[in-house]
UniProtKB/Swiss-Prot annotation:
This is Tyrosine--tRNA ligase. Coiled coil: none annotated. One of its GO terms (molecular function) is tyrosine-tRNA ligase activity. Belongs to the class-I aminoacyl-tRNA synthetase family. TyrS type 2 subfamily. One of its GO terms (cellular component) is cytosol. It is found in: Cytoplasm. NCBIfam families: tyrS (TIGR00234). PANTHER family: TYROSINE--TRNA LIGASE, TYROSYL-TRNA SYNTHETASE. A motif ('KMSKS' region) lies at residues 226-230. PROSITE patterns: AA_TRNA_LIGASE_I, S4. Signal peptide: none annotated.
């Protein structure tokens, strides 16, 4: 096992906040594997690179010799996490949650070592709690403290409803740490309230409180908003190798090092070496190719990574995107048909040409042929190809933000 200092440096890499660092140092000094917990509510079947920030950190803990607990919130998934939400989320059925959970497991084991990963379901202990147990759990926190959360506070002050079951979510997540006797819990920055709840409940139940490590929310391909499927600025880990490759090669230069730090398994020493190469005149696109190949290999295998540049779809005669791929912003007030976007982006002479290209299969979005039914989402960024020679990395921005 690495020294405490070496472990701490890797643990803190890319992290937003570590609470409490001195406590974690003491835990590490004992020289025993720590129980590292991260919970995931399977509320959608497909993961994107934003989800993998936490999973990558779990892998780093795993490589340091610690016990990883990949907690699937099949019980909490039926409540719905209210974090950052302005309205009550519709609950999922147990069948939906379990179906999604199986899909999650097949995806996360492309990152985690399944032989060294403990998979847990929080229904295992939550289903056994009696009404009296739930009342005891609920008595550990007050409504006033719950309303300190920004999302609850905003909804309360704007007279929007907050269902009682939503107050239970952070309590249940906190109780998961009690049930698992977690030493460390990971979560996104939007989960800090829930993670701290785990510390408080562990104290209340006579356990040593866990340390918490918050990880940043990964920016999407637009470099501004968090990665989200609904915003169209995501890279899905099950996307075809060529599509994944083309999206990653076309990220803004300003986003490149952020992605390396949070998504790459290269050491910081190696990443700093790549930065030095870039400062010495290396083409940033060549550096992004290294990142793209690493991630394609992780999720699709080495052979797929070696061929990804030729299967990217957005290719010229040598199977490559142009080095000078233009960055194009198109202002809009709402989602827009692809024909209008191509016209406004200047990738076609007029709307009629756009319609003709769409009808003949001459338009590709992120490597995939699309037809006139494709809708460009407001805030989304895509690599667009119209015909054989017109390329652009197009972002549909709000007219308000473009003023």
């Amino acid at each position: 096992m690495k020294s405490v200092e070496e472990q701490l440096a890797l643990i803190k890499r890319g992290a937003d906040e570590l609470l409490v660092e001195a406590e974690l140092v003491e835990k590490l000094k004992r020289g025993q594997p720590l129980r590292i917990k991260a919970g995931f509510d399977p509320t959608a079947p497909d993961l994107h690179l934003g989800h993998t920030v936490l999973i990558n950190k779990l892998r780093q803990f795993q490589d340091l010799g610690h016990q990883i607990i990949f907690l699937i919130g099949d019980f909490t998934g039926m409540i719905g996490d209210p974090s950052g939400k302005s309205a009550t989320r519709p609950p999922l059925t147990r069948e939906q949650v379990l179906d999604y959970a199986e899909t999650y497991k097949s995806q996360v084991f492309k990152i985690l070592d399944p032989a060294k990963t403990e998979v847990a379901f929080n229904s295992t202990w939550m289903d056994k709690l009696s009404p009296a147990d739930f009342i005891r759990l609920s008595s550990q926190y007050t409504v006033a403290r719950m309303l300190e959360r920004d999302d609850f506070d905003k909804r309360y002050k704007s007279n929007q409803s907050i269902a009682i079951h939503e107050f239970l979510y952070p309590l249940v997540q906190g109780y998961d740490s009690v049930a698992l006797k977690a030493d460390v819990e990971l979560g996104g920055t939007d989960q800090k309230f829930n993670l701290l709840m785990g510390r408080e409940l562990q104290r209340a139940y006579g356990q040593e409180p866990q340390c918490i490590l918050t990880m940043p929310l990964l920016e999407g391909l637009d470099g501004v908003k968090k990665m989200s499927k609904s915003l169209g600025n995501y890279v899905g880990i099950q996307e075809a190798p060529g599509i994944m490759y083309s999206k990653l090669v076309s990220i803004p230069d300003s986003l490149m090092w952020r992605y390396f730090e949070l998504l790459s398994f290269r050491s910081m020493e190696e990443i700093n070496g790549l930065k030095a190469d870039c400062e010495a005149g290396a083409n940033p696109r060549d550096i992004k190719i290294k990142l793209a190949e690493e991630l394609v290999a992780r999720f699709h295998g080495e052979e797929a990574a070696a061929n990804a540049h030729r299967s990217a779809g957005n290719r010229m005669k040598e199977g490559e995107l142009p080095d000078d791929l233009p960055e194009i912003s198109v202002a809009a007030i709402e989602d827009m048909p692809i024909s209008a976007v191509l016209n406004k982006a200047g990738l076609v002479k007029n709307a009629a040409v756009a319609r003709d290209l769409l009808a003949s299969g001459g338009v590709r979005i992120d490597g995939e042929v699309v037809d006139r039914g494709f809708v460009f989402k407001l805030g989304a960024t895509h690599v667009c190809q119209a015909g054989k020679k017109a390329f652009g990395r197009v972002t549909l921005v709000s007219e308000e933000s473009s003023k």
